[in-house]
């Protein structure tokens, strides 16, 4: 099972992401966090395989959260997400979190695996 950490300050997105992860074959929800700080601490304790991190959060934002997660564990795949409507932000390699689904989650993982293959 691929263990997933979701970090987002939106309660409604955390609920939706929880449903998607639970419904996705081969994935399990390891933890959810409402702040970047909480996400970093949970990642340290739980060592997830995949972290879905919102870009825009109060406190430490998604980029800083991702940097701290990467410093803690080189084994966690980190995906930055946004719901920003402007295409320039989405085209920067950010996942449009409005499109999160079991199929999208599987594709994210498959791309991460291909990128890590030598």
Sequence positions of predicted segments:
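Active-site residues of response regulator receiver
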Residues: 8, 54
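Hydrophobic/aromatic residues positioned on beta-strands within the core alpha/beta folds
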Residues: 81-82
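Receiver (REC) domain active-site loop signature in two-component systems and cognate sites
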Residues: 57
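Two-component/phosphorelay signaling modules centered on CheY-like receiver
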Residues: 11-31
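Output/docking surface of receiver
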Residues: 91-115
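Conserved phosphotransfer cores of two-component systems
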Residues: 44-46, 68-75, 85
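Acidic, metal-coordinating helix/loop segments flanking the phosphotransfer/catalytic sites
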Residues: 32-50
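Acidic catalytic/metal-coordinating carboxylates
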Residues: 35-38, 61-65
């Amino acid at each position: 099972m691929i263990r997933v950490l979701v970090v987002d300050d939106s309660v409604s997105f955390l609920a939706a992401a929880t449903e998607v992860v639970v419904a996705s074959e081969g994935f399990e929800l390891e933890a959810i966090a409402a702040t970047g700080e909480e996400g970093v601490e949970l990642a340290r304790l739980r060592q997830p395989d995949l972290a879905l991190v919102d870009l825009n959060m109060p406190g430490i934002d998604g980029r800083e959260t991702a940097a701290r997660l990467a410093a803690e564990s080189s084994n966690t795949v980190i995906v930055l997400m946004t719901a920003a409507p402007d295409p320039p932000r989405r085209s920067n390699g950010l996942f449009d979190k409005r499109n999160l689904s079991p199929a999208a989650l599987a594709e994210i993982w498959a791309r991460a695996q291909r990128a890590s293959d030598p």
